[in-house]
């Protein structure tokens, strides 16, 4: 078995005892197969040759039928490998002085596939097997004859066969045998038979040594003091094999080293190529800090999927943490098929990068790598406003105070973009998804990917229709021109959604409530405007502010551009500096300015004159919608 194969020299003793004579092992022996005598008189049954077998038989027959006998023998096994053995050897009693046609491997030089298992063979053998063969029903893989002496004693009167094992260094065998068999062996024997030894190898070589034998006329366990256990030579190692192994190992190590070196060079090359950046001339004029692409890779963990915050037509947004400062950031990466290209990218970094307002998402910097464009913003942990509009039972509902503040924050940001900064900026994509909420529940406008920059005093109109369906003003669809008034239209819809706690289009709502603007106007006309607010905030102490925002939202979302107020007027109403007149419902109902009562026109004039100062009536109507 494997643990005992660690002992290279396996030595046992064979002594043969017969009732009629004493037999000397130096008598006439026949050698077959790989068997050969060595220089010291021992018989070597097998050697380094694989899948071979050897036999040695005494040429003198012995009378054995109806007789008692004892066999004791000394042999040694030196396997090729210390952790695994070959197949083993056997002591055999045969009708002939040899077993022609025997096979190697598991057949041990005794039989072959045809002769194995036939009782007519009259072959009796004791296996000294060092490998378990399931097909022959081996009792286990701890085989006898590996590191022990073996005595085989058969008493014909008692019809008992005993097999005893004990260490080679002990001269006296133990009294208790390892195996005992009560059976009459006479039917298996002929009158005259021969005895000998066989051995075989498989895919692993082994030296099987037959060392000595003799006979005595009685059944007994003799003493072994006169037996000298020889020292067997180790299994030979061919220098050529050793050289081949050394060369193979060296070659393998050399190939591995070349492979590793090539891999390292490739990684460094691709990594360098991956993070290599080119600075264009147009980038010099823009103020925001340019981030190294490698820095963004580290911050976003190579833009892993688990860092993804969202994806839209503009591209993807990833969460990241800047190394060193541990500041949380949001990185917007434009996708290859994004609607946002270089022109929009330049517009964004040229505008928001210079803007500083508490209700605008701060642009920290940008990066450009290959075909991708990156914008780095402050991270807003509470996400976007749209998630608070979903009627999900698990979603925390906003209080009225939070809603009112969010509306004022968005209005303040738009006022800054439209009128307070040195240049007029049209956002063009105001919607709940672009209103981000920070950790203190402050609202900030983000995603300036569709923003357009114009010098103050020039015609602030564009020819490209952009935005999100549902939030696009009617005139923008007709003319394709975006103005500050189109931003006001979208803001009015957002205001109504925040107060009502729902989307402007609700397919699951009753038919008369599907379109938010129409439903609110219907409630207002029936004197139930307060019922449009979300139930969780519908408290009497909030009635005045709720109805104010609903009316203002309808005014801002009016389908006629000239009827909408500008953001300056909106902020004054929200701050209580200005009030909406009582007859505002007539203004909201009006299709256009023609045919509108004079008092209603005066209402519009009043709203817009707050923001345009000393402008004339005509200029007021022309300029409020920038």
Swiss-Prot record:
Residues 303-562 form the Protein kinase domain. Residues 22-212 are annotated as: Legume-lectin like. ATP binds at residues 309-317, 332. Its EC number is 2.7.11.1. GO terms for molecular function: ATP binding; carbohydrate binding; protein serine kinase activity; protein serine/threonine kinase activity. Residues 22-245 are extracellular. Pfam families: Lectin_legB, Pkinase. It catalyses: L-seryl-[protein] + ATP = O-phospho-L-seryl-[protein] + ADP + H(+); L-threonyl-[protein] + ATP = O-phospho-L-threonyl-[protein] + ADP + H(+). It is found in: Cell membrane. SMART domains: S_TKc. Residues 1-21 form the signal peptide. Its main location: membrane. The active site is at 429 (proton acceptor). Glycans are attached at residues 28, 59, 112, 162. Residues 267-626 are cytoplasmic. The chain crosses the membrane at residues 246-266. In the C-terminal section; belongs to the protein kinase superfamily. Ser/Thr protein kinase family. This is Putative L-type lectin-domain containing receptor kinase V.8. It comes from Arabidopsis thaliana (Mouse-ear cress). The gene is LECRK58.
